[in-house]
C-alpha cells in the first residue's frame, strides 16, 4: 500500500488498529485476551470514535491540547477506561508536524492553553499518577497554577519526563519513537514484525506505566523476561499469560509502538504482506 493513498488520520487509525491486533504482546489486550474491565472492542471503538479529532490533527486546524482533549472526549464514551491517551499524546504532534522533525517544532510552540486543555483531558481518563505531584490533575487549582507559572504543554511534559516515557518523547525529539520505527523496518513487514519490535522494546526499556502500578522491580523483571523470550530461554505465550494473570500491562510501550507504526507507515512500511 502506498502511504500517499491514505491521509494522516487514516494512517493514525491504521497504526492503532495494527498495534492492538498484533499478538501475543505480553500483558496487553489483544485479539486473544481481554482484561475484565477493558476489552478489545473498547480499543477498536476508541480508534473509530476519535476520527474527527485525528482529522483535525492531520489538518493542524487547532491547538495540540485542544485536539488531545477532543480525542479523549470522543473516545471516552465506552466503559473500558483509558485506551489511547498516551497514543494521542504522541500521535497528535506527529500528525500536526508531518513527521518527527515537524513534531519537535510543534511541541516547542505549544501554549499555556494547550497545557490547560491537556489537563482537562487528563482529568477525563483513569490514568494512574504518582502521588505527591505538585501539579496534581485531581487538584481543582491546577489550571490556575499552570497559568500562574506560565507553563506551556512542553513544560508540562518536561516536568513529567523523568517518570513517564511518553512525556519523555516530547522533550527528547521523539528519539525512542524513531529508534522503534527503525527497528520495525529491520524486523520486516506485517504482524510478526510488530510483535518482535514490541518484545525488543520491552526488553530494553522499563515501562513507566508498569512502574507506576507495580514498582521498579517488577518493571525490570519484565525487561529481563522479555530478553529471555528473545533469546529463546522463555516461552512467549507463557510469559504473556503470566503478565495477564498478574495484570502487568506495559501500556506505555504500546503507546510508543503505535507512534512508531505511524511513523513507519508514513515512510512506506508495509503491514499487509
Which residue ranges define each predicted feature?
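Long, hydrophobic/aromatic-enriched structural stretches that serve as scaffold segments
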Residues: 52-102
